[in-house]
Amino acid sequence: MSILKLVKGVLYGEGEHHEKPKKTHIVIIGAGLTGLLLAQGLRKLNARLEAEGQSAPFTFSIHERDESSFYRGGGFSLTIHWALQQLYDILPEELSARIFECVGNPDAIKNGQMGSFTFLNLRTGEPALKTTIPPGWKGARMSRVRFLQLLMTDLDIHYSHRLSQITFPTDNTVRAHFENGDQETGNLLIGADGANSVVRRFVYGAENSKNTQLPIRMLNCRSEYPLEELEACLRVDPHLFHAGDPVQDGYFMFAFLDMPPAGSKNGKAGVQLTISWPYESGYLGQEAPSDPPTELPEQLAWLKHMAKHWANPVHDLIYGMPDDSIVRVIRVQEWMPNDANRRPTDGRITTVGDAAHLMTSFRGENANHGVVDVAKLLALLAPSGNKPTDLREVPVPVSTDDA
């Protein structure tokens, strides 16, 4: 059974007369970007239908495994570019109007400085590639924490709900069981639970849902610097830039996360530094492949070792990293769906975002694909006139694989 048939059956009873349409309850597993975005999209869809004189067809609940939204930090930054219009389409107007409050350097945006795509040679400090952003291009390099806070507006999130099992009590319901003993029954269950998705594991099995670890290691850092120490970075780009080492291999990314108040000359700016290297024998003279250290002093020492022959501005950034920097080890992984390994769920379960198609962060596409997943899923769920849209007439993305 497809999502379409299930929604028709729940909302309209297919073949039966109902004085009041039933509501479809959607159980959202995961309160990250895609889970919150789906919830906001359902809010907007309900409001639109009510404004048209129809009953709001959807209810939903959000279930997060952690005990708070930022229990594990919330991440650093993300870029929405080719999916920006879909983001506007999904969000209620009062939230879409505030998207650019979440950017790392809001004054640059206000001044029309959309930036460039710049890739530096780490040995010379000069651009190996610099492409100016064309006029009219829209995109937002956002603080992930601020963006998630925006998406949480007016949402009720059930925390400490770590999914343990999924069952099917009736022909048109699905039930989520949580480790704390709680349960939630709905008509659709959407797995928005990230890279190590429990929903994906249920649908594809433990072995077929394993991520592939790539031969790359990465450290993601958040540091604060006096603004005057970042003037060279601002000259490269007011938002972010990338860089690579053509001699020893290695990748670097810089992004502004938080800027001091406008006009401040003594304030500090929060920035993101991302560094990765190949996991191979002999790298930087190490006999064995180099895993990232787990303790901060050793992590900072390793980064300085990598940056020894790098040019400014990156050299001084690395050597000047404060001792209170936040450094996280990032697993560079991917997962591709294979429907040959998929168990049938009668249209009651699907996945979005990293749960559906985990990819590496180097192209910065994860968030954009997650936004488009949600937009397409909402299009599949939205009624057309007095009946749901026929999913057979809508292009189905990989992630809405149960459509």
From Swiss-Prot:
The keyword Oxidoreductase applies. Its cofactor is FAD. Gene3D superfamilies: FAD/NAD(P)-binding domain (3.50.50.60). Pathway: Secondary metabolite biosynthesis. It comes from the Eukaryota. GO terms for molecular function: monooxygenase activity. Disulfide bonds: none annotated. Induction: Expression is positively regulated by the azaterrilone A cluster-specific transcription factor tazR. FAD binds at residues 75, 144, 354, 367. It is an enzyme of class 1 (oxidoreductase). InterPro entries: FAD/NAD-bd_sf. Its EC number is 1.-.-.-. The keyword rRNA processing does not apply. Transmembrane segments: none annotated. Keywords: FAD, Flavoprotein, Monooxygenase, Oxidoreductase. FAD-dependent monooxygenase; part of the gene cluster that mediates the biosynthesis of azaterrilone A and other azaphilones, a class of fungal metabolites characterized by a highly oxygenated pyrano-quinone bicyclic core and exhibiting a broad range of bioactivities. The first step of the pathway begins with the non-reducing polyketide synthase tazA that assembles one acetyl-CoA starter unit, five malonyl-CoA units, and catalyzes a series of Claisen condensations, methylation, PT-mediated cyclization, and finally releases the first hexaketide precursor through the R-domain. Belongs to the paxM FAD-dependent monooxygenase family. PANTHER family: FAD-BINDING DOMAIN-CONTAINING PROTEIN-RELATED (PTHR47178:SF1), MONOOXYGENASE, FAD-BINDING (PTHR47178). This is FAD-dependent monooxygenase tazP. It comes from Aspergillus terreus (strain NIH 2624 / FGSC A1156). The gene is tazP.
